[in-house]
Amino acid sequence: MDADSSSRSPRDTRTCARPKEKVPYFADEGRERDRVRNLRHRKTSITRPTTSHRGRPMRARSRSYSAERNCCQRRRRSRSCERRHSDTRHKLTTATVTKQRRRRSRSRSRSRSRTPRIITVPVPVPAADYPYAYAWPPPPQAPQFNPMYGAVPYGMPSRPVYPAHPYFAPYPRPRLTFPYRAPPFRPHPRFSYRNQRPAPN
């Protein structure tokens, strides 16, 4: 090599620029950009689970909790459709992986537990021996106006007095109502009493 500096070989590194010190990758914009791109494009290999893919444990009743379904994601879809896709289930491509990772998880209010059990608690009900429609205090009696029947003093009774007629009583009981105490009959102002048929029984 000559003393002439113009004849230096290109590999000669005597006057090479001093290498700039390395900044960490998150500070160097270019390196960070291709690091993220490599992360995104890297092939993810999915190891297939070692459990048997079909069948369910002997004592498990529901098929939703079996190895027959996808182990990490319980989907509700028909079994025929699942059988059709059963070989594709564990071979997930990168796009599917990304899409599944991006998908929103199910809202926390939708419970993942099984069918809720109806819990029956014996609650001591006071006065359990009273008849079904018994209410106390008795409901206020609205003045009954039923145009199908003729004018009845005090309107129609809303429900029969309980018990209505004890047929097999040891002796005939006295009547519980006293018709002579009924108030004088006043015709209803908005009801016409002509052409009355007898009330249907």
UniProtKB/Swiss-Prot annotation:
User: Which keywords appear in this protein's UniProt record, sorted alphabetically?
Assistant: Differentiation, Nucleus, Sexual differentiation
Residue segments, region Disordered:
1-117
Q: Biased composition, Basic residues: where in the chain?
A: 38-62, 99-115
Q: Where in the cell is it found?
A: Nucleus speckle
* Basic and acidic residues biased stretches: 9-37
The record, for Pfam families, names: Transformer (PF06495)
Alphabetical GO biological process terms:
cell differentiation; female sex differentiation; mRNA processing
Q: What does this protein do?
A: Member of the regulatory pathway controlling female somatic sexual differentiation, regulated by Sxl. Activates dsx female-specific splicing by promoting the formation of a splicing enhancer complex which consists of tra, tra2 and sr proteins.
What is the protein name given in its UniProt record? Female-specific protein transformer
Its lineage opens with: Eukaryota, Metazoa, Ecdysozoa, Arthropoda, Hexapoda
